[in-house]
């Protein structure tokens, strides 16, 4: 059993990680940590997340000097569900002691220091780790994940978008010069637990945000190898992302070629389901799956992708990366 530590366990993604680690046959939940100054320190995990009363009642430990010493000397791997700049500070400390780090923040996803000052509001000081980090898009990057010590788990919108677009891009089916258009909606849990007016019960409404400046647009483009036009929306529901993507196909591309591109890409990869009918949030909420379907008319293609933003868009994809890194079946503990 691998002693597994979660830092940032009070948040939504951290909570999902805790439940997945608890149920994983090869992992032991060794510690749930929050920042030393957190108001949640010493509270029971289940007092914040009552769905796990009686199942996960461990205390949330402060990440103070004693906590760091315990992790550095006794843990086998670390999951970071922390703010981007916090992950950028903590990851090198764990890596220096030989601990594999699986980071759910955006701190190591894009190999460009300027990206972080432009889109994340902090100066990234560790170019070497940016180069060493493996992007944890599990179905597409397993060799790099297995070889790396630092795995940058993709963002939720990028996961939904890249799973839908990479089969087409890899097969060379997208028209030259065409920017795929991604229209995506996420539940309010994507904004985290911190209270805000626009995500409060009486205020939340389907609405666009982040036009031309959302940090996930360059992440998608970087890992697709192609510029995209990305418009996210806040949805008035708890969890899940639905991405509707518009793509112009290269001249002469047939529906059979499109079908074969998706079938080849996801053969033997059970956590991506090619549903044959347009997916829905209901079909993926609280599951580790990405559901994809598509329809072609002439040279235009509509691809729809659905995931749970807290699972396939965060915690369960991190579990896939752990499974790949340690040689387990990628779906272990998930299905």
From Swiss-Prot:
The keyword Amino-acid biosynthesis applies. PROSITE patterns: ARGC. Its EC number is 1.2.1.38. GO terms for molecular function: N-acetyl-gamma-glutamyl-phosphate reductase activity; NAD binding; NADP+ binding. Keywords: Amino-acid biosynthesis, Arginine biosynthesis, Cytoplasm, NADP, Oxidoreductase. It catalyses: N-acetyl-L-glutamate 5-semialdehyde + phosphate + NADP(+) = N-acetyl-L-glutamyl 5-phosphate + NADPH + H(+). CDD domains: AGPR_1_C (cd23934), AGPR_1_N (cd17895). Pathway: Amino-acid biosynthesis; L-arginine biosynthesis; N(2)-acetyl-L-ornithine from L-glutamate: step 3/4. The keyword Oxidoreductase applies. Catalyzes the NADPH-dependent reduction of N-acetyl-5-glutamyl phosphate to yield N-acetyl-L-glutamate 5-semialdehyde. This is N-acetyl-gamma-glutamyl-phosphate reductase. It comes from Aeromonas salmonicida (strain A449).
